[in-house]
Amino acid sequence: GRIVKQRAEDGLLEDTFVFYFGDHGGVMPRSKGYAYESGLHVPLAVRIPKNFRHLVDHKRGDRTDGFVSFIDFGPTVLNLAGIKPHKELDGVAFLGQGVSAADLAKRDEVFGHADRFDEKFDMVRTFRKGKWKYIRNYQGYYADGLQNNYRYRQLAYDNWRDLYRADRLNPVQRQFFERRPVEQLFDLEADPHEVNNLAGDPDQAKRLADLRGRLRSKMKSINDLSFYPENRMVTDALGDGVAFGRKNAQQVSRLSDLA
């Protein structure tokens, strides 16, 4: 609020785009650091300044169901400034010239990931298309409730684990402390909390294979480096991870297929 007030006092508010978004939680289990929707899906509001409304194909108060990722912010700001985003830049503009409200509403795919969080390492990748979400747990032998000092300072985590150890949880509640399946598939409309895994449902076999392929293609396209151990990353990729990924693209692809 202070920044917006200052922009108004300086006479610059109607020349300023304001992007207002939430964090990924932190005190509730399955929020910050997790690849569930409770950890990935955050609110976003954009204030369009009067002097630049001609650049945006939205009316005041409009809402959209189109998917936006944080990597889209860079290309969006460049596009609003009249600068064509470089083709190798991650993300896609969601406002500005060439981006209609109808086009944005059609965007129904998004990639998600989780890796290291403090002393906890857990490689997870996700691909969502519309209401369907695919999760690949590369280290499914780890439970979601694996010890993490930051998290277990929060009462909800600590109390939940105490109830698990006392055998006072139902099967759904126990999932958080037990090993996860390698693959998970969720219908987010019917199951917004992602507890009913449909990956083993024969009726969903075709959809499972499709989303699995989409995720693998995405990981290869960005040269996902998490297949390498961290000590290798520190010695060989810390200076320029992008260059390291390009140089080792074929190996990344083979590791992805192997995993």
Report residues per predicted region.
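A generic secondary-structure signal for well-formed alpha-helical elements
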Residues: V4-R7, G11, T16, P49-F52, ...
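Long, internal low-complexity/basic segments
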Residues: H41, D167-V182, A190, L198-A259
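Conserved beta-strand positions that form and line the central face of beta-propeller blades
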Residues: V27, L44, A93, V110, ...
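Polar, surface-exposed loop/tail segments
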Residues: E14-T16, G61-K129, D203-G213
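Short, solvent-exposed loop/turn and secondary-structure capping segments
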Residues: V4, P29-Y34, V56-D57, N79, ...
